[in-house]
Amino acid sequence: TGAGRGGCTLGLPREGPGETPCSSSGSSPFPGRGGHFTKSRKLRERLFKELETNVSLRVEETDSPDQFVVFGRGELHLAVLIETMRREGYELQVSMPEVLTRVGEDGRKEEPYERVLISVPEEYQGAVMEALGTRRAELQDMRPGERGGQRLEFVIPTRGLLGFRNAFLTLTRGTGVLSTLFEGYGPWTGAIQRARQGSLVASETGTTTPFGLSNAEERGQLFVGPGVPVYEGMIVGKHQREGDLEVNVCKTKQLTNMRSSTSDMAIRLTPPTDMSLDKCLEYIGPDDLLEVTPKSVRMRKRELDAKMRKRAQEREREAVAR
């Protein structure tokens, strides 16, 4: 994916495998602006030093000297490691979490499963069951809870839980309780469609303006406010429809005799959605990267150039058609 990138993959080495690649910031348009450690050598030293105290972690080097694969115990495990390194002054990039699979005794592909226990008020029960159903969860038990509401028990592929926790909090308005337990390995269940809309992607490098943001927020939900440095290919919001959309959030209003720059003061913008590290890890897709620095967390497309992204998508469609 380009020189100067390291990679780490989150997975569970013993039970409940899940994974996500991460990298150094060499391919970022804003390298070294917020961190002290930006080189892959420093990233390697830090990752291998972590093995001395973090017994659940495993680090593997790849064919590329600046890419690594890190195996952990889940999304939270990776998030804690990334946040710790971020506060220490490291810059890195992370890609979408994935799940580790294995080949069973019969030669078939197997994946990890989790047992999910949920306590939820009755009014949100249907929404939770529907959301888990699309993630290939199977209901094992349903009974009244001790303090009211319903107690639900599911068995679900670990892949189905990736990105679900924040969605669960939204579905239950923060009133639900969710806990998981590793169940074991089972047959591969096939593709799981992620209920994910497209992204609003910055088409130019610059600083966001109220005028540019006001046009963009008509197309979806923004992640950035005015006065924020952005670059081409950076994800600045969630598209209200499927598919990514390029937007110019740096666009300025053309001044005339009847208009002045002070007229931007009259533009009212909806406050942007605060995307924490955990939320970003759950949001990014296969063609996205999460750029983490001590001062900011930014999501971007793996390929920053819009024309190159379209060509790559066309090649993928042609490969699938064959």
Enumerate the predicted regions with their spans.
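Accessory interaction regions appended to the cores of large information-processing enzymes
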Residues: T1-R322
